[in-house]
Amino acid sequence: QDIRNQGIELTETFETPIFCYPGDTCIDVMQREEIARRAQILFIELTFLDDRVSPESARRHGHIHIKDIIDNEELFADNQTIVFMHFSSRYKPDQIHRILQDKLPDSLRSKCHFIPNTNIFGSSTDPTDLSQIAVMHAQSTQ
């Protein structure tokens, strides 16, 4: 009580972004934007998963390659849930799952999910209920 009467601040406010979706972008968004690094839930593109397209070519065309994610894993340390999306149509959902399991480092694998591409009519080869992302996040933070 004496400290408060002296006008000394006893509380500190912290702002934590809950959700971030940087859109169709390169890995530099994670290097440049603190809000993306601090977001509890990050939706981010991951267009290329193998050597058919190089990381350099992916960046030149405004996309992210899995090597960019792996080489910059420390940028995702504060994200509690990461949802990859915007995959090249060359990848089927089962391939995406297998490649992510095989290539992602342990520090990322447990908090990563993916949404497969859908066609213009809204159907998907692996239907995903987006509301489940919030459920997965809630379960992972308990």
Model-inferred region functions:
Residues 48, 88-89, 118:
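Active-site-proximal loop/turn and secondary-structure-junction residues that shape catalytic pockets
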Residues 90-92, 121-122:
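Short, active-site-adjacent cap segments at secondary-structure transitions
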Residues 109-120:
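Canonical P-loop GTPase G-domain recognition
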